[in-house]
């Protein structure tokens, strides 16, 4: 029997490369989470999940590791502190967290708390986010930057927040916004703190490249900046502009694109300073990416640079341009939301079932006893008997052709149902035999690599793809997926992951593998009377807020966890997932009204003696219990 150890598992899931030293596999074969890359302390995910289930917290469970979040904030700030020191940069760096990346109150409050020592700020892009930002800032005195489209109410709220002492900057995205600002400044007499968003020619890379460039949704072109300056000067507001902002897209995969944007943005800054504007801050926006697949490449699910390289380039490029222009260096702001929160949350859920055909009949005896077989079936029998590594390619192609032929013959009425079933059974036997041969061949012939798809099983997991990792469906984003136990054993199944929605799109067929993107996930056969859990990693950015309620599957249970030296971990907060009545309420159904209508219907049935009183009572109890229960599946 082939030996297998946890290092082998780490390789096939590429865990060491995407895990950022925050995830590992222990001697038991379970995935562990570390509070920081340098920490030897860890939490065993399988033990944690078992403990949560004992506490009646059912899967799917979103695990939020607050120490990891704190560590990510620290690592970004540490990288910039080091870059400032190495480059003798004369100004400061400040992190702003864009609330849109993860708007959950407890998460934003934690970021505000952990980020105090770094003077962290919040970036908001809508009226609800503005209100949330003001609320969080009220207890923490956090600075706020306001981006996005703005109406008069938005602008007036910012003005009055400024008047009563909030540190808040209103960024002008369009000229018509500036006209509204001027109008409201005259009306209220309140002097704002302003910023200007610049539309750079530079573009990012990957899925969000269109966020930058001449056709970008936001920002002022150079000619519009000149017009804005004239308008500001005419109305006595030019000295209120303290910041310029640019953003060339999220998850920028190539560092050279970042450098190009920094040079262009810094040139705009120096020119505006030469024109007499008192700009103090350059907000370089987001874009600091996450290496989701561990390839350290420019592929859209990876990045070809580190946080340290990013920080160094930001500081160096801006300083270099400013020194050449003889202009004072600005304070630098970045909005690195994805890199801050992606790693800290993990979704864990149980596998409910697989599509393994446990009741498939064995046709061995029937085939042996048959006096005459359909020609197609006979050819498949012959291939199965004779196949070896030297006839592999030809036999594989013949097998594919014959199974297609069997389907056509069945549809035309020339094969019976039993004969088609025999053909399918033989096809499966041949593919398994091919697999056993191919596993010993290195490298695998290219034309045979896809044959494994025929062996791929479907593992049905207790979650909604659309609710918990919508980017996997919407933009084909890769997220690392790993079973959290039995990693000291060799996986014996290749699988796809299907959710429990009634939608054929609710299936994951692209995974992070040892050599990049792969079409199957290695898993273990499900043992009887054993729970098997799968973890979805690096899902802390955008997924929670983008998740939708397809089939009315609601928010999952969420648990906030911190490390504890004595007990291993502490549960800080448990946030119950949506009950059925809560999901129904989103679409205007009310629990009491549902019960009332059903009860009235049942009473008519009782009166007509179609339903017994006991049946009516039991059904109402069952319905009531369902309304109060979790939207996801139990036993």
From Swiss-Prot:
Pathway in which the depicted protein is active: Amine and polyamine biosynthesis; agmatine biosynthesis; agmatine from L-arginine: step 1/1
UniProt EC number: 4.1.1.19
Gene3D superfamilies with a match to the protein in the record: 1.10.287.3440, 1.20.58.930, Alanine racemase, Lyase, Ornithine Decarboxylase, Chain A, domain 1
InterPro entries documented for this protein: Ala_racemase/Decarboxylase_C, Arg_decarb_HB, Arg_decarbox_C, Arg_decrbxlase, De-COase2_CS, De-COase2_N, De-COase2_pyr-phos_BS, Orn/DAP/Arg_de-COase
Top-level EC class as recorded in UniProt: lyase
Domain of life: Bacteria
GO molecular function, one term: metal ion binding
Disulfide bonds: none
Annotated function: Catalyzes the biosynthesis of agmatine from arginine.
Protein name stated in the entry: Biosynthetic arginine decarboxylase
Organism: Geotalea daltonii (strain DSM 22248 / JCM 15807 / FRC-32)
């Amino acid at each position: 029997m082939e030996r297998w150890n946890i290092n082998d598992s780490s390789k096939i899931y590429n865990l060491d490369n995407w895990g950022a030293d925050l995830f590992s596999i222990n001697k038991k074969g379970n995935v562990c989470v570390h509070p920081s890359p340098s920490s030897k302390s860890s939490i065993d995910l399988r033990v944690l999940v078992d403990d949560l289930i004992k506490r009646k917290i059912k899967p799917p469970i979103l695990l939020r590791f607050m120490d990891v979040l704190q560590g990510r904030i620290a690592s970004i700030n540490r990288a910039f502190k080091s870059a400032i020191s190495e480059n003798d940069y004369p100004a400061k760096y400040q992190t702003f967290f864009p609330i849109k990346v993860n708007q959950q109150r407890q998460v934003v409050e934690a970021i505000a708390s952990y980020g105090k020592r770094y003077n962290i700020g919040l970036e908001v892009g809508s009226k609800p986010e503005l209100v949330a930002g003001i609320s969080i800032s009220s207890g923490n005195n956090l600075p706020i930057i306001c981006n996005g489209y703005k109406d008069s109410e938005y602008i007036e709220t910012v003005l009055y927040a400024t008047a009563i002492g909030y540190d808040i900057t209103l960024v002008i995205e369009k000229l018509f916004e500036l006209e509204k600002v001027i109008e409201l400044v005259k009306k209220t007499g309140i002097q704002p703190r302003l910023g200007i968003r610049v539309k750079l020619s530079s573009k990012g890379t990957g899925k969000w490249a269109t966020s930058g460039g001449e056709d970008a949704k936001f920002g002022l072109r150079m000619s519009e900046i000149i017009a804005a300056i004239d308008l500001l000067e005419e109305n006595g507001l030019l000295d209120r502009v303290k910041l310029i902002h640019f953003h060339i897209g999220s998850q920028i995969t190539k560092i050279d694109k970042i450098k190009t944007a920094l040079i262009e943005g810094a040139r705009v800054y120096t020119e505006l300073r030469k024109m007499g504007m008192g700009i103090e801050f350059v907000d370089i926006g987001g874009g600091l990416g996450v290496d989701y697949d561990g390839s350290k490449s420019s592929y859209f699910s990876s990045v070809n640079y580190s946080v340290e390289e990013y920080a160094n380039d930001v500081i160096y490029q801006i300083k270099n341009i400013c020194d050449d222009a003889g202009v004072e260096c600005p304070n630098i702001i970045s909005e690195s939301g994805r890199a801050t929160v992606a790693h800290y949350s993990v979704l864990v859920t149980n596998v409910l079932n697989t599509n393994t055909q446990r009741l498939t009949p064995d046709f061995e005896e029937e085939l042996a006893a048959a006096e005459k077989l359909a020609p197609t079936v006979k050819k498949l029998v012959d291939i199965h008997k004779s196949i070896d590594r030297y006839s592999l390619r030809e036999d594989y192609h013949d097998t594919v052709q014959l199974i297609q032929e069997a389907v056509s013959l069945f549809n035309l009425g020339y094969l019976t149902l039993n004969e088609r079933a025999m053909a399918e059974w033989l096809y499966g036997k041949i593919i398994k035999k091919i697999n056993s041969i191919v596993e010993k061949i290195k490298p695998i012939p290219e034309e045979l690599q896809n044959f494994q798809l025929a062996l791929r099983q479907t593992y049905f997991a207790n979650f909604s793809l659309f609710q918990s990792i919508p980017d996997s469906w919407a933009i084909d984003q890769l997220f690392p997926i790993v079973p959290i136990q039995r990693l000291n054993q060799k996986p014996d199944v290749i699988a796809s992951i299907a959710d429990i929605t009634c939608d054929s799109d609710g299936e994951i067929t692209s995974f992070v593998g040892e050599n990049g993107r792969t079409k199957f996930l290695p898993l273990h056969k499900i043992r009887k009377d054993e729970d098997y859990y799968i973890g979805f990693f690096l899902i802390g950015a955008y997924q929670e807020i983008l998740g939708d309620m397809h089939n009315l599957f609601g928010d999952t249970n969420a648990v906030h966890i911190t490390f504890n030296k004595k007990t291993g971990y502490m549960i800080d907060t448990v946030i119950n997932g949506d009950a059925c009545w809560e999901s129904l309420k989103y679409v205007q159904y009310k629990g009491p009204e549902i019960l009332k209508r059903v009860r009235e219907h049942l009473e008519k049935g009782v009166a007509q003696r179609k339903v017994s009183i006991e049946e009516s009572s039991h059904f109402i109890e069952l319905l009531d219990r369902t309304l109060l229960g979790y939207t996801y599946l139990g036993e």
